[in-house]
Regions:
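Hydrophobic-face positions in mid-chain alpha helices that act as interaction patches
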Residues: 221-236, 242-252, 264-267, 271-384, ...
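Inward-facing hydrophobic residues that define packing positions of alpha-helical scaffold repeats
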Residues: 116-119, 196, 203, 276, ...
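Bacterial Sec-dependent N-terminal signal peptides
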Residues: 1-30
């Protein structure tokens, strides 16, 4: 993974030139620095990499939007092992008015909109720059442009999921701004429907832009050995490290998978199905690009790198996670394995290689890999199982419960469950089974809470609040 670390080390170049107090201001310290930064192709590469670093900050996917705060809201962890004065204990009770909880919520907003400002800055620069600046000419320019558009869409989508109601309870009000210009003169707030259309537009354009690299010229880079580890056949490896590790980047299929997630949120179930199916069936040289590791091999690949479509990198992940599973810590992220995995002896996700034990309860081993181990820094954002769940829901909403069950069982079988197939008799029955499967499959990945919210299902906890108030200091 040392080649990827070289990429990550270069990310600080952008951040050092883009520090600012305002969440919509990315002006560098002086114009000379900006002019110098974007005079060469490396400046654009560093700027893009800086956006990924922003995405992986602890205030976003590095912790709070993956295995931390958002998992607490989804009640994945037992509050019995949380100090009563801790931010997480208060968050589990939906005490959004608490100062500590407010700070985390404010961090979501400021991190996202600062990242969005960086996206807009890069999009503005790259769209007007001569192709001669880029080593790989049009392919590289379009790839950078497309990834920046996709990241802008992702930041906005997550802020909408946090600070606006789901489409199940949408009231037509305007909750967040969609900022897509540089420099910013003023901001305009939009309805959920308007925001989703803007997200869709950005993602469709982004996918078209990255297609030349990922689909037309280098489809082999989408295979797991290249996508996650950059160690395929030496003759086909990217000469430049910048083009490696496409699984940590907004590649063509990551954008397609994100579109599937967005369409599902929008209740456009057929569009969501089509995008999810495109990912599930994606091939190169007659081989599926995405799959599941064998259930017997899962213990040696606890994150299932074969099924990862998009991840972020946090090189301090193991150290960040360790205090929350240490036996003498005052706040620990522990769960009841017997409850989540329903006592299954077949489900390898509940095996000792996947979960550790403390005081008769469990913790996830996803983020306990030693530094330097393959994938130790990976935090999954989108994985293959979610695509199967999206396809299953489409079938269920069309009363095709047999096919819906087959989609759920495709993931269950991959995890070792072969003796108990899903027998679905109604949409409500399907939703209940779906939520159970998501809880098992995506522990520590921050998706369960959003599924509850999307479905307006508040049965999992008392006093659930699905919409954050906009931070007081961020009023426009």
């Amino acid at each position: 993974m040392s080649r990827k670390r070289n990429i990550v080390c270069s990310l600080f170049v952008m951040l050092l030139t883009m520090s600012s107090c305002s969440w919509l201001d990315v002006s560098p310290s002086n114009e000379v620095n900006e002019e110098d930064m974007f005079s060469k192709g490396d400046g654009y590469r560093n700027a893009l990499n800086g956006l990924y670093l922003k995405l992986s900050e602890s205030s976003f996917y590095g912790r709070n939007l993956s295995w931390g705060f958002i998992e607490v809201l989804g009640q994945q962890y037992l509050t019995d092992f949380m100090e009563r004065t801790s931010t997480y204990y208060k968050a589990a009770g939906y005490k959004y008015d608490d100062a500590d909880v407010k700070s985390v919520i404010s961090g979501f907003w400021s991190t996202a909109y600062n990242g969005i400002a960086g996206c807009n800055h890069l999009i503005f620069k790259v769209s007007e720059t001569d192709l001669s600046v880029f080593q790989e000419r049009e392919m590289e320019r379009n790839m950078i442009w497309g990834e920046a558009l996709a990241l802008r869409a992702l930041f906005h989508f997550d802020i909408m999921r946090l600070f606006a109601p789901s489409m199940e309870t949408d009231d037509g009000k305007k909750y967040i701004p969609y900022v897509d210009s540089y420099p910013v003169i003023s901001t305009t707030y939009y309805t959920n429907t308007e925001i989703l259309k803007k997200i869709e537009s950005d993602l469709l354009q982004a996918r078209d832009l990255v297609a030349k690299c990922d689909i037309e010229e280098h489809p082999e880079w989408m295979e797991t050995s290249y996508r996650m580890f950059a160690r395929g056949m030496s003759s086909e490896l990217p000469e430049e490290v910048f083009f490696a590790y496409r699984g940590y980047r907004m590649n063509y299929y990551a954008i397609t998978a994100l579109l599937a997630r967005v369409y599902l949120w929008e209740k456009e179930y057929k569009k969501a199905f089509d995008c999810a199916e495109a990912v599930v069936k994606a091939t190169h040289n007659d081989r599926l690009l995405f799959g599941f590791v064998g259930s017997s091999e899962l213990g040696g690949d606890v994150k299932d790198s074969e099924s990862l479509i998009f991840t972020v990198s946090n090189e301090t992940l193991t150290d960040d996670f360790k205090p929350f599973i240490t036996s003498d810590s005052k706040t620990r992220f522990l769960f009841s394995g017997s409850s989540i995995f329903e006592g299954s002896q077949e489900d390898q996700r509940g095996s000792s290689s996947m979960v550790g034990n403390q005081e008769s309860v469990q913790y996830s081993k996803k983020y306990t890999l030693a530094e330097g181990t393959d994938g130790y820094d990976m935090i999954p954002v989108i994985r293959l199982s979610e695509m199967y769940y999206i396809m299953a829901e489409y079938y269920a909403r069309n009363a095709n419960f047999i096919e819906a069950g087959k989609m759920l069982d495709a993931v269950r079988s991959a995890r070792g469950i072969i003796s108990n197939t899903s027998n679905i008799i109604s949409l409500d029955d399907f939703i209940g089974k779906l939520l159970k499967e998501i809880r098992k499959e995506l522990i520590g990945e921050g998706q369960l809470y959003f599924q509850y919210k999307r479905l307006n299902n508040n049965s999992f906890a008392d006093g659930v609040k699905f919409v954050f108030d906009r931070p007081e200091n961020e009023e426009i």
